[in-house]
Amino acid sequence: ADVVLNSGIPITVIGWDPSLYDAMIDTEKIQEIESIGTKYSKFTNDIQVVLREMMKDIFGSDSYDLPDPLAMSVYLDNEIISQSAEVNVRVDTRDGMTRGGCVLDYLNLEPDAPKVRVVQRCHGDKFYNLLKQSLA
C-alpha cells in the first residue's frame, strides 16, 4: 500500500460507511432484483445468503450491502459520489499490529504526505439504478 500511495497516481479510496449507508439492499430491493429474472440477478441475491442471515441475527432486517459493486460503480461513474475529501495519508510500515494500516490526516498535519480522495457518501439511488442495469 505504501508503494502505491507514494506512486503519484490519483487514488480514490472508499470505506465501509458508504456501503452501509448508501449501498444497502433491503427487502424491497431484494425482491426487485429477483424480479429482474436473469441469472445475474438471481446470483446477486443467492450469493448473499450468509450475509442476509447475519444481518437478520444482528440487526433484525433481511438486507445486505454491496461494497465491491459500489467501489466499481464509483470507478465507472464518479457522479455516484455525493461527498468526498482530499486528505493526506500515510501507511504504517513499522513492525507490529498496525503494520499496513492507513492513517488519514484530515487535519493536514503532514502536508507533504501523499493525498487520496476519500469517498464519504454516495448517491444510493444512482448506484442502485446502475446495479439494476448491470443485472438486466
Say what each PLM segment does:
Residues A1-N6:
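Active-site glycine-rich loop that binds ribose-phosphate moieties when present
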Residues I11-A136:
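Conformational coupling and interaction surfaces
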